[in-house]
């Protein structure tokens, strides 16, 4: 079944800093095989955080991607990407902002 990857402007802006084109393709293939990889972020309505290897670093020291999977449409909404060394977890305000952004985006796409 075909999947669609929708990138936020933030994800699009920073992706090249963290992932090579090949690493990005591998990440997409991994998500298509197992769309619910990563941990659900509590209090966000289903957003997930996944560890990815980035630019020669392993998954543990690599990057984190926040995404949402809309199952009925096989859409992956890629919201943001950041290095593990930059931030460990999202704070309450960031979670709230991402959830609001995702809700608006999802309503726009339906």
Swiss-Prot record:
Induction: Induced by amino acid starvation and the protein synthesis inhibitor chloramphenicol. Keywords: Toxin-antitoxin system. InterPro entries: HigB-2. It comes from the Bacteria. The keyword Metal-binding does not apply. The keyword Magnesium does not apply. Toxic component of a type II toxin-antitoxin (TA) system. Inhibits translation by cleavage of mRNA. HigB-2/HigA-2 has been shown to stabilize plasmids very efficiently in E.coli. Three hours of ectopic expression of higB-2 results in bacteriostasis without any detectable loss of viability. This is Toxin HigB-2. It comes from Vibrio cholerae serotype O1 (strain ATCC 39315 / El Tor Inaba N16961).
